A protein has these predicted regions:
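Extracellular/lumenal mature domains of secreted and surface-exposed proteins
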Residues: 1-274
Length: 274
């Protein structure tokens, strides 16, 4: 009978990262008649009698590659030959990181630590136009120049030397900046000074006024009376603390000068008769 030689080719069109669909193509040297018999043992508990089978292979490890011994046995005229080749399924890394905060007022600085497994390279992607960064940790500052909440997605991409990859991301919410500002209708005058305040604060919801005389207010634009019973001019330092519903805060202080009222005073000196 003619001599037969078992042979086959292996192809994984989608690559060798878990899970892998592998195509096996018979390339044995054997007579075409009678019809040869094929028996495939894929080394994973599965078998096949097809000439050119397809088989799925898995690797549930995140750190080590898995190798399977695939054996083809061909039979013709009761003559047999076998060939064993190895199939290696590369592991997939798992992307994971810890982050110290996911929300806050602009500028928001975050610190993230890489907790991934099985990777050979890591890449931090910031979603704000900044260049990607590598390494086991990253510190990044996010800005928000709008008047509404601005979201960013911080992504960690990891990859092995074989090209197997994974990624994970977390949503960050950066709250708008609060700017405290106000104008004083009467910044200086003779006691008493009654003045209103024009509130020019931006992105604020709550206001706390301290008039530096023991009195406070939470009105948006309060009216206040400043007194001065001394003989000297007095300056009050008015403080406005503006805050948002997101607990973003800004403070500004401006002076109100209250001049002392002049006091008329004279003395009479009795003179002798002229």
């Amino acid at each position: 009978y003619p001599n037969i030689t078992a042979d086959f080719a292996i192809d994984a069109p989608q690559g060798w990262c878990h899970p892998v669909e592998v195509d096996f193509t018979d390339q044995s040297d054997l007579p075409s008649s009678p019809t040869p018999q094929y028996f495939w043992d894929f080394g994973n508990g599965a078998t096949s009698t097809a000439e050119n089978p397809t088989q799925n292979f898995y690797n549930f490890s995140n750190t080590e590659d898995s190798t399977y011994d695939v054996t083809l046995e061909v039979t013709s005229y009761d003559c047999k030959d076998t060939l064993t080749r190895q199939v290696t399924i590369n592991h997939n890394p798992i992307a994971k990181f810890d982050i110290d905060r996911t929300e806050g007022c602009t500028p928001l600085t975050i610190n993230a630590t890489n907790q991934s497994t099985g990777q050979d390279a890591s890449e931090w992607r910031f979603d704000d136009g900044s260049p990607y960064a590598s390494g086991d940790s990253t510190t990044h500052t996010y800005d928000n120049t709008t008047n509404s909440v601005k979201p960013y997605d911080l992504e960690l991409y990891v990859e092995t030397n074989e090209g197997c990859d994974d990624s994970t991301d977390v949503r960050l919410n950066v709250y708008p900046e609060v700017t405290a500002d106000f104008d004083i209708e009467t910044p200086q005058g003779c006691a008493p000074v009654v003045t209103g305040f024009t509130n020019n604060s931006q992105n604020a919801d709550n206001y706390n006024w301290d008039f530096d005389d023991g009195l406070t207010s939470s009105q948006v634009e309060p009216l206040h009376k400043f007194t001065n019973t001394s003989k000297h001019d007095t300056t009050y330092h008015v403080e406005l603390i503006s805050s948002s519903a997101f607990e973003c805060v800004d403070t500004i202080t401006q002076p109100v000068k209250v001049n002392a009222q002049p006091q008329a005073e004279f003395t009479i000196t009795q003179e002798s008769d002229l």
